[in-house]
């Protein structure tokens, strides 16, 4: 996931020469502060904004155990919604296709200078590879950013899962709870 500083760097990057790319960047940042899956995100409308929060039922749980997810909107989300308040399309924000959205995310990351090296598994060989962050950024990076940064701030898995839509004790949720270097530093300093 990206840090809050990286998210802000992306959000503040001057993409005025590429207005369509700037729109997709804004959508990514919005997704990273509300945390929903891209499949749910594409279906959101202005009616999903209820009393200062994003409210929706996840597609993934709709058929067997539907739960309403309610994520209060922070100042970044409100800024983005204000920016697109005159958008008259059927969706909450002006999406392009998921494939083009993923490509736009990569371009926006690169133009914003989000180029740190990350280690990822090659899906074919299952061997670790080092890549630039902008090469591996996707819509799912937004969800990971939301969950990872939220967990880093509150360290309460139940509270975080209440806004991410995961069930309590979910195996899927555990993979988002990375213990980063800063958290390890805090941990060892408890012994000082």
Language model feature labels by segment:
Residues 43-49, 151-153, 161-168, 175-179:
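A short, basic/aromatic helix-end/turn motif that makes direct DNA contacts
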Residues 60-62, 98-101, 164-189:
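Catalytic-site neighborhood detector that most strongly recognizes the C-terminal catalytic loop/helix
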């Amino acid at each position: 996931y990206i840090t809050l500083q990286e998210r802000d760097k992306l959000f503040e990057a001057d993409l005025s020469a590429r207005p369509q790319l700037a729109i997709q960047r804004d959508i990514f940042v919005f997704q990273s502060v509300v945390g929903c899956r891209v499949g749910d995100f594409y279906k959101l409308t202005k009616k999903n904004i209820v009393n200062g929060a994003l409210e929706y039922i996840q597609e993934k749980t709709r058929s067997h155990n539907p739960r309403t997810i309610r994520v209060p909107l922070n100042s970044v989300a409100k800024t983005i919604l204000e920016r697109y308040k005159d958008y008259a399309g059927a969706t909450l924000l002006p999406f392009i296709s998921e494939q083009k959205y993923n490509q736009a995310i990569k371009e926006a990351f690169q133009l914003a200078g989000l180029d740190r090296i990350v280690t990822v598994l090659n899906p074919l060989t299952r061997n670790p590879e080092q890549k630039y962050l902008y090469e591996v950024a996707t819509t799912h990076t937004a969800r990971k950013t939301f969950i990872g940064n939220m967990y880093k701030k509150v360290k309460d898995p139940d509270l975080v899962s209440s806004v991410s839509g995961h069930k309590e004790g979910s195996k899927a949720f555990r993979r988002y709870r990375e213990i980063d270097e800063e958290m390890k530093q805090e941990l060892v300093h408890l012994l000082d």
